[in-house]
A protein has these predicted regions:
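Mechanotransmission and gating elements of multispan inner-membrane complexes involved in transport
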Residues: 50, 86-87, 106-113, 139, ...
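Short, membrane-interfacial amphipathic segments enriched in basic
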Residues: 1-6
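Hydrophobic alpha-helical transmembrane segments of multi-pass inner-membrane transport and secretion
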Residues: 16-43, 251-287, 310-319, 363-367
Length: 388
């Protein structure tokens, strides 16, 4: 005979203060756990959204980032001649020869310097990134010292407002527009004319070449052709995969740190839940004896106390996820371990994170209630009734 579910729920309500305090402790641990997962998801989304599966990116063989790469002009011309390069509506090749440089700018709030990516793009650079759109001002004019800044850069860095001037590459550059790139990493970049930036930084090669594929499935053919060409020392990747790889080191660090903290904090929360359940068993010894005398089996007693601890864990999990969901409106910036530049992104809550967080809370509840439930199930009827 099973103990009614309403009995289990009623017992949680009887000890309102103890239940609330224990659930709050579990909720704080779940909050930390969920927030770390949201941080990792936001980072991955930002860098994955930066690339498009329809675009191919060419960098120097062995280079891990565009900053480290160098593609000579002659090699870029060979890439441009490939039949897999898509054409625009006007017959132009949808391709951009780009240069990527790191500079140091001061933040508006703290006046402390931080690295920022400067990206020189070709005439088709904007067309290759449909997620990028101008929201203020205008596009820079090719052949001039004009630049446009990502939304995050305009907000965070001094001199990056429209009409303001930044000095780098021994020149003054005027900010003529701000662009929004959705959730992508381009929001943390400054764009200008590629050839002007190459001249300003005294370079003789591009950092990368990006082009739209005529067929997204045709990547392997052009990849094999370019990487086997003896004139070239390049490597070709799908743009979305390239940027996803950029998140690996930072993502791994965040996950390890978050899991470690969650395990440490969960130990305390689990012990708290265990103390609560032991106290519940001690206070209800006579009640347990009465249930046994009425014919309820040991397994029913065990299941009732386990269910009670699981409900306690679930309550803490729901509260923790609710608190963590508020972080979706918080922006965060950190250094990208691959490029050593600042990257701005937001906390992202997904259905998977909600499920994982609730499972985590149930595990804590189960761990905290398992031993007390066994103790309750092992109580003898006579001893329990004597305690009354």
């Amino acid at each position: 005979m099973a103990i009614p579910f309403s009995y289990v729920v009623r017992n949680l309500g009887v000890r309102k203060v103890t239940t609330a305090l224990t659930a709050s402790g579990l909720a704080l641990v779940v909050y930390v756990f969920a927030t770390v997962l949201m941080l990792d998801a936001g980072l991955r989304q930002t860098l994955v959204d930066t690339g498009s599966p329809d675009n191919a990116l060419v960098i120097r063989r062995g280079a891990e980032t565009e900053v480290q790469s160098g593609v000579e002009r002659a090699q870029a011309d060979v890439v441009e001649s490939q039949p897999e390069v898509a054409l625009g509506s006007g017959g132009e090749r949808l391709m951009s020869k780009e240069t990527v440089v790191l500079i140091s700018l001061n933040k508006r709030a703290t006046e402390k310097p931080s690295n920022v990516v400067i990206r020189g793009v070709g005439p088709q650079g904007l067309a290759l990134r449909p997620q990028v759109r101008l929201v203020e001002g205008r596009m820079f004019r090719p052949g001039t010292s004009e630049i446009i800044a990502g939304r995050a850069i305009g907000q965070r860095f001094a001199g990056a407002g429209i009409g303001e001037t930044l000095r780098f590459g021994m020149r003054d550059w005027t900010v003529v527009g701000h662009f929004d790139a959705g959730h992508s990493g381009f929001n943390s970049e400054i764009w200008g004319d590629a050839d002007q930036l190459i001249q300003a930084f005294r370079r003789n090669a591009y950092s990368s070449v990006i082009f739209r594929l005529t067929d997204a499935e045709g990547l392997d053919a052009v990849k094999a052709r370019l990487e086997s060409d003896p004139r070239l020392t390049v490597e070709l990747k799908r743009e979305s995969i390239f940027y996803a790889e950029q998140s690996e080191q930072l993502s791994t660090f965040i996950r390890y740190l978050g899991v470690t903290l969650s395990i440490i904090f969960s130990s305390g929360a689990t012990i708290g839940a265990m103390i609560t359940m032991y106290a519940s068993v001690a206070n209800r010894t006579a009640e347990i004896g009465t249930l046994r005398a009425l014919g309820f089996r040991r397994a029913s007693i065990l299941w009732a106390f386990l269910l009670e601890s699981l409900l306690l864990g679930l309550l803490g999990g729901i509260l923790g996820v609710a608190l963590a969901s508020l972080m979706q409106w918080v922006s965060f910036s950190t250094m990208n371990f691959q490029t050593f530049s600042e990257l701005a992104f937001s906390f992202t809550l997904t259905g998977k994170i909600v499920v994982e967080s609730l499972i985590f809370s149930l595990i804590m509840g189960l761990a905290g209630g398992f031993l007390p439930a066994i103790r309750a199930a092992r109580l003898k009827i006579v001893d329990s009734l004597r305690a009354a």
